[in-house]
Amino acid sequence: MQHYGVNGYSLHAMNSLSAMYNLHQQAAQQAQHAPDYRPSVHALTLAERLAGCTFQDIILEARYGSQHRKQRRSRTAFTAQQLEALEKTFQKTHYPDVVMRERLAMCTNLPEARVQVWFKNRRAKFRKKQRSLQKEQLQKQKDVSTDGALAASDKDEAPSTLNLENQPPSSTSSSSSMEAEAAPHALGSELSVELNVTSAEQSGSESATEDNATDKEEEIKQHREDLKVEKEPAPGNLSPLCKRLSPKPDSPLGSPAISSSSSGVTGGISQSHSYSSSPLSLFRLQEQFRQHMAATNNLVHYPSFDMATPSSIPYLGMNVNMPAPLGSLPCQSYYQSLSHHAQQVWNSPLLQASGGLPSHNSKTTSIENLRLRAKQHAASLGLDTLPN
């Protein structure tokens, strides 16, 4: 059992120190026989230390020698050559074995313990650097992912807002286009119904409001006055009526509807195209007009409306006798030729068969007048397109 003395230090150490002191005294006594003997400096200093120093210093001197205080090792300063050799070995392996450490110590003139500690510190430094790099990479990935998500969300929001903004205009534009497409059809259907049902005056006023209200109403009033005046001549003479068939010189040739209510459908549609449509479309309009005339003949059932068949003669005659385009002809000669053809038609024996027809009222004559003028308009359209 170990006994502890003063201040917790073991008695064994104190006994060893006393034994050492006793041995030293014995050696000094044996040396006194020599005449020149003097006590050694070491013995004196040791005696002085034992006498004047503290008990802790005695213990430290017994353990570590006369320099009893533990000296701190100075930091090793590696040269460039030593560091280069150590780094090359570290690139090969992070955990060199004892043999590699001994060889490296011999090459670098360093203790093997220093080489081992250097590798330990170098591995710690390497791990720290790797952790920092991983953190940086993770941060960059997070930033990139967040930026990409924000950009994607912005892109998704932008087209959605654009679509929301564009949807009402597109719907309105589609509805407006549908209305624009439906408008000509509605006008055409209304005009055809009015042509079949209403009188000549009402249909004339409808087409007048469509093109030029004041001019057309004046023409219709003038036609009424002419009809009243020319009821007085003989019933067989219908040449004034043929004169009335020719349009006025001051009316423009390019107008789509020449004061005729029955040509309101074709004139209204072709007016929107300003005669820039193809000849096929004009021919289709003419065919539709002929069908419409046949339908009106079937609906009204007047006994005197057999003249619809010879009324196609001026159209054919103008196509045959006038090959030149309409724009190259003087207006007055064109009107005279129209009146000449109309006189031939009205004086033909086909009309003489129904000679007792001046008993028509003003409505029937105005309808005939408007129908023939519509035929004349269709013929002018045919002349415009045939030379091309």
Swiss-Prot record:
Location(s) in or outside the cell: Nucleus
GO cellular component: nucleus
Location of the DNA-binding region in this protein: 71-130
Coiled coil: 206-232
This protein's record includes keyword DNA-binding: yes
Compositional bias ranges of the Basic and acidic residues kind: 133-145, 213-233
Transmembrane segments: none
Name of the protein in its database record: Diencephalon/mesencephalon homeobox protein 1-A
Compositionally biased spans, kind Polar residues: 160-169, 195-211
Function (record text): Required for eye and tectum development. May act as a transcriptional repressor.
